Amino acid sequence: MKRIAVLTSGGDAPGMNAAIRAVVRKAISEGMEVYGVNHGYAGLVAGDIFPISSKGVGDKISRGGTFLYSARYPEFANLEGQLAGIEQLKKHGIEGVVVIGGDGSYHGAMRLTEHGFPAVGIPGTIDNDIAGTDYTIGFDTAVNTAVEAIDKLRDTSSSHGRTFVVEVMGRNAGDIALWAGIASGADQIIVPEEEFNIQQVVKTIDDDFKKQGKNHHIIVLAEGVMSGDQFAQELKAAGNTSDLRVTNLGHILRGGSPTARDRVIASWMGSHAVELLKQGKGGFAVGIHNEELVESPILGSAEEGALFSLGEDGKIIVNNPHRARLDFAKLNRSLSR
């Protein structure tokens, strides 16, 4: 394999630039040429493809976001979009692709491989919700950003004797809420993976103020449960009498310079992705399990360890989906009382 491409797709995540840098420099060290694709699959279809040199990634490891830009491009799920992208790959003489992103990005990589273009996936999303890996690029930075913000909110919360609901990203997974909640000493953590009783939440708030003598209360809420504003309304309807404020950390969690861990993991994964292409292992994704690099086929059966399989209706099924550490929720309950 003499020429490969790299693209980022879906939501941006701190550490994506470190992964791109590793792909470029590892590939060049192996005698390959590397091309970047701007704006993900949309840029692939449009032919927004250009050569990248080792010097071109020299100052990127510390930068957040992705200098290749990113976009969601659902049209790539259609055969027409896939064939248009493949035509551009052929036009540029590209023989393999590294795709950095989440589940949707992996689906695109799977389709490219099915059409004869080897593609390897690298998990890049702050939500940490990808099957086949314990850890996704951007998660550590997002958690640290959330903790820093919650620590500051605690200062103002305790100054005024208030309850704060802090909404964090996590549409399908509560990992950011769990990790940030524990690290910041939150009083309650609400995640999609665990049922909650709104009356019990209100009782815990009351007990903290009236029985425990606390002068503030912090609730970390994953967005996949409901919005912070809706949660506040439900608290009020359930009888909450404390002075309540809602803060949505939102997209701030995606920004900022990546942590050392995100930079190292991204570099490790990026380098290994090139090794997989070199070995002809298209259709695989890189991951981390028990602090070791692992690789999983993107499409196949659950028994084969594949990330996805196809149902009888042709719809994509997630095999062994990522599960949040709910034992962390139990840990937080024991530490916050």
Curated annotation (Swiss-Prot):
**SUPFAM superfamilies tied to this protein:** Phosphofructokinase (SSF53784)
Q: Which InterPro entries match?
A: ATP_PFK (IPR022953), ATP_PFK_prok-type (IPR012003), PFKA_ATP_prok (IPR012828), Phosphofructokinase_CS (IPR015912), Phosphofructokinase_dom (IPR000023), PKF_sf (IPR035966)
Please state the pathway this protein functions in, per its UniProt record: Carbohydrate degradation; glycolysis; D-glyceraldehyde 3-phosphate and glycerone phosphate from D-glucose: step 3/4
Query: What is the protein's given name?
Result: ATP-dependent 6-phosphofructokinase
Under Pfam families, the record lists: PFK
Origin superkingdom:
Bacteria
Q: Has keyword Ion transport?
A: no
UniProt organism field: Streptococcus uberis (strain ATCC BAA-854 / 0140J)
Report which gene this protein is encoded by.
pfkA
